[in-house]
Amino acid sequence: MENQQQDIIKNQVTKRRKISMEENSSIAKTTIKLKNTIVDEPLSKYKSKILPLEKELFENLNLEWGVDIISEDIPLIDINNNEYYCHLIRTANPDPDKDNFLFIHGFITSGLHFFALIPYLIKRYNIFIPDTIGMGFSCRPQVKFSSPKQTEDFLISIYHIIIENIFFKNLYNIKKEYYLCGHSLGGFIASRYMLKYPKGIKKVLLLSPAGITNHKIPGTNIGSNMNCCFYCLYIIALTCLWPCKIRAQDLYICCCFHNCIKESYGFYDFNLDEEEIKKNKDGSKFIVDEEKFKEILSNLAILSLEYPGDLNDCIYYLFTLPPSSTFLPIEGSLMYLNTIDIVFVYGKNDFMDKFGAYRLNQYDPNKYKIYTTKFGGHSFAYESPKELYPIFEEFF
């Protein structure tokens, strides 16, 4: 199947294509007016539970809270004086001599998605992992999405404020350059952000990014990249979830699904039984207490679901069907407008579409690198984290 895809791509990449009007319009500079938006205050009953759990989680990763790693809520104000706060996991004492890495998480998750990379990366970089506004444990503004462009502009403008505060307002006395990484929906956001605000970005790492491929190009078949099971789920999502704009939070508060989601959500399927993943380079255990660690992750995931007013419905306005097809594909913009090197990584059993990444690699193999892990699926960053270490060593 991989060879078949590459043959199709080689035939297609020789044909020059114009960037669609949709892609051009998505890059145009715009502003978001949300003066009527009601932004909630930090909810103390959630915050009082979240911080102790995060502290315990990272201590279970052999990281000292307040010395190696810390989390905080940073205040943000947009151009219309709307106030937000962003929950940020970061290096506790940023080193001005180290390089910086900023991570953007994906759909129905938080910055904790990258937990398995933190013990390795924190020794080499200042790391900053914000929860996207409206997700994780950041504030939940009541934004009413209406179109792909408006949704994208909101997310990009918010991240512009976050990144300006971290790197360009001397908040932490660090370098103004940084590496940018995005996973899934976060990969879509990172790509769009890079095209609009390239200042300071050294390289970009896209982990199974959504929204890259332009499915209007002949021969790009979404279903051909999925096994039968995922293709069936794909059709179910198309016919049921998408028209109704159902969120995980909606399912969670529904009596019919409450117990099911509560029992399963947050139990990440990382390979704790594999020694190369369980152990750090110095031989110490990667996770001190595995069962306790799973319990903490589950409790944090449940708190995120119980935290009212999430904005995860943004995907219904950005994508025509998860996780591949988007109203505003990025492939053409990256091919003709991008000046920054990008590394794409996909899991061995990843359901995410790779056509666009392969076409970009064929177009310019020096600027666009692509790798597939030997283990893991869409969430290989915690299923098989050490496979990413050589990529960090080589490119970052």
Feature map (PLM): residue ranges:
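Conserved HGGG/HGGXW glycine-rich cap/lid loop of the alpha/beta-hydrolase fold
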Residues: 84, 89-141, 183-188, 196
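Structural signature of beta-strand start/N-cap positions in the alpha/beta core
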Residues: 100, 126, 177-179, 202-203, ...
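Catalytic histidine-centered segment of alpha/beta-hydrolase-like enzymes
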Residues: 352-353, 376-385
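The conserved SAM/SAH-binding core of class I Rossmann-like methyltransferase domains
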Residues: 102, 128-130, 207, 345, ...
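Catalytic histidine neighborhood in serine/cysteine hydrolases
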Residues: 362-378
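Alpha/beta-hydrolase fold catalytic core
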Residues: 1-101, 122-125, 142-157
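Active-site loop/oxyanion-hole signature of alpha/beta-hydrolase fold enzymes
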Residues: 132-181, 197, 217
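Flexible "cap/lid" subdomain of the alpha/beta-hydrolase fold that forms the substrate-access gate
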Residues: 148-152, 159-160, 197-363
